[in-house]
C-alpha cells in the first residue's frame, strides 16, 4: 500500500523513469529546472538500495552531499589532472576494488558537469582493476544538459577536444555502448506562469528573449545571484558592514580526509546581529529547509535565525564527507565517513554564486550581470531560481 501511495505522487514521465530504473534499465533522466529530478531520483535510490548494491556519485563534493552519495573521484580514484587514458587510471587497493566490483547500479547526479573523459575514466578504471565495466552494470545519469557545464581552463579544453568531439559526457567512448533510455521531465513545478516558463525555455535552448528587459532595474530585491564569486563577496561584505554592533566569528572544526571545498559551510563564519543569513540544511522537524533565508539573532551564547517573526535555534551541524566501503558480512557497499566539518549551518545571504544556487528556489531574486556569465547554462540557472516573475530583478550595470 505504501509503495502505491508513493507512485501516485509521480507525474507520467517521473513514473516512466521510476519503472525503467526498477527494471534494471540504463536511463538518462533529464529535464528543465524545477521539474522534480531530485525528488524522483531519491525515490529510485531508496527502492533500488533494498535489493541491489547502488553507488550514488556526483562530480563535486557539495553535489555528492546533496544527493546523499560520494564524489566520482573518491569512489573510482580518478586522477585530477590531464585527460584520462587507460594508462593513467589507477590500480586500486583491494578494499577499493571490492567496492567497485560489487556495484550493481551506478547513479551519477549533476551529469551536465561530467566531462567525457571522466565517464571513460570510470569505465577504464573498472576494467583495469578486473571489475565489470560500465557496459556490464546498470547506469543511471541525472541532470539537465542546459544547466551548468564542466568548468575548465582553455588549455585543458583544447587538450580534451583533441581526443573528443565535444566536452560533455555524451561524447565519451563508452556512451553509445550504454544505450540509455532518455526521459525528459517537462512539467515545471517551481514556476506556474506560462509566459515566464516559455521565455525561460528560450534562454535554456541558447536563444535570446527581449521579454526579460522589463525586469531591468538599478536596485536589488531579495537575494542577489551573480556569475562571479568576487561580485558575491562584495555584496556580502557590504551587507555585513552595514550592520552596526559586534562582529561574531565562528571557526569550523574540520577533521579527517577532506578539505574546506568539500562542504557548503563556511570555514570561518562572520556574522552580526540583524544580518541576512541562509540556512544550509534541512532541520530535523522540517521547519527550516536548505535555502531558507532569515535574519541572524544572538541571545547570550545562543544563535537563532528569525523567519517571519519567529525565531529558530541554530545548532552546530556535522557535515560528513563519505566514501564507499564493501561490507564482507552483508556483501553490500556502504557509505563510510572519512572526514567532516562541524559548523553552524548558515552563511551570509545578501548574495550567492549562480553555481552554488543550483537546486535552490527563492521568492525574490536579483540577477547581477554587471560581470557577464562565463559558463554555459549560468544565465538559465540564475533566471530559473525564482518562483515567480514578480520576484525577479536584473541588473546589468552598477
Give the role of each language-model region.
Residues 1-398:
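Conserved ATP-binding/catalytic motifs of P-loop helicase motor domains
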Amino acid at each position: 500500500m505504501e509503495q502505491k501511495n508513493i507512485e501516485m505522487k509521480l507525474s507520467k514521465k517521473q513514473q516512466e523513469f521510476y519503472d525503467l530504473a526498477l527494471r534494471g534499465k540504463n536511463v538518462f533522466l533529464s529535464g528543465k529546472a524545477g521539474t522534480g529530478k531530485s525528488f524522483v531520483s531519491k525515490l529510485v535510490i531508496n527502492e533500488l538500495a533494498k535489493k541491489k548494491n547502488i553507488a550514488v556519485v556526483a562530480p563535486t563534493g557539495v553535489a555528492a552531499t546533496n544527493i546523499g552519495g560520494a564524489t566520482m573521484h573518491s569512489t573510482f580514484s580518478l586522477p585530477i589532472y590531464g585527460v584520462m587514458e587507460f594508462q593513467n587510471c589507477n590500480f586500486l587497493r583491494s578494499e577499493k576494488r571490492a567496492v567497485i566490483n560489487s556495484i550493481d547500479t551506478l547513479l551519477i547526479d549533476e551529469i551536465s558537469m561530467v566531462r567525457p573523459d571522466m565517464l571513460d575514466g570510470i569505465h577504464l578504471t573498472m576494467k583495469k582493476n578486473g571489475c565489470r565495466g560500465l557496459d556490464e552494470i546498470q547506469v543511471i545519469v541525472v541532470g539537465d544538459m542546459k544547466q551548468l557545464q564542466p568548468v575548465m581552463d582553455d588549455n585543458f579544453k583544447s587538450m580534451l577536444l583533441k581526443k573528443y568531439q565535444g566536452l560533455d559526457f555524451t561524447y565519451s567512448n563508452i556512451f553509445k555502448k550504454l544505450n540509455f533510455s532518455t526521459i525528459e521531465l517537462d512539467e515545471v513545478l517551481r514556476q506556474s506562469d506560462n509566459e515566464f516558463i516559455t521565455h525561460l525555455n528560450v534562454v535554456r535552448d541558447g536563444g535570446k528573449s527581449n521579454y526579460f528587459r522589463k525586469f531591468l532595474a538599478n536596485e536589488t530585491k531579495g537575494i542577489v545571484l551573480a556569475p562571479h564569486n568576487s561580485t558575491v563577496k562584495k555584496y556580502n561584505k557590504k551587507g555585513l558592514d552595514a550592520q552596526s554592533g559586534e562582529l561574531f566569528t565562528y571557526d569550523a572544526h574540520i577533521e579527517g580526509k577532506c578539505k574546506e571545498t568539500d562542504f557548503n559551510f563556511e570555514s570561518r563564519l562572520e556574522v552580526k546581529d540583524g544580518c541576512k543569513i541562509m540556512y544550509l540544511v534541512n532541520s530535523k522537524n522540517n521547519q527550516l529547509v536548505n535555502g531558507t533565508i532569515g535574519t541572524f539573532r544572538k541571545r547570550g551564547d545562543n544563535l537563532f535565525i528569525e523567519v517571519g517573526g519567529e525565531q529558530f535555534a541554530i545548532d552546530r551541524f556535522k557535515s560528513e564527507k563519505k566514501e564507499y566501503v564493501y561490507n564482507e558480512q552483508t556483501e553490500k557497499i556502504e557509505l563510510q565517513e572519512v572526514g567532516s566539518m562541524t559548523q553552524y549551518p548558515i552563511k551570509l545571504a545578501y548574495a550567492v554564486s549562480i553555481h552554488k544556487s543550483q537546486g535552490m528556489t527563492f521568492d525574490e531574486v536579483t540577477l547581477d550581470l554587471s560581470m557577464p556569465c562565463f559558463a554555459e547554462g549560468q544565465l538559465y540557472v540564475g533566471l530559473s531560481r525564482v518562483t515567480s516573475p514578480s520576484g525577479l530583478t536584473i541588473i546589468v550595470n552598477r
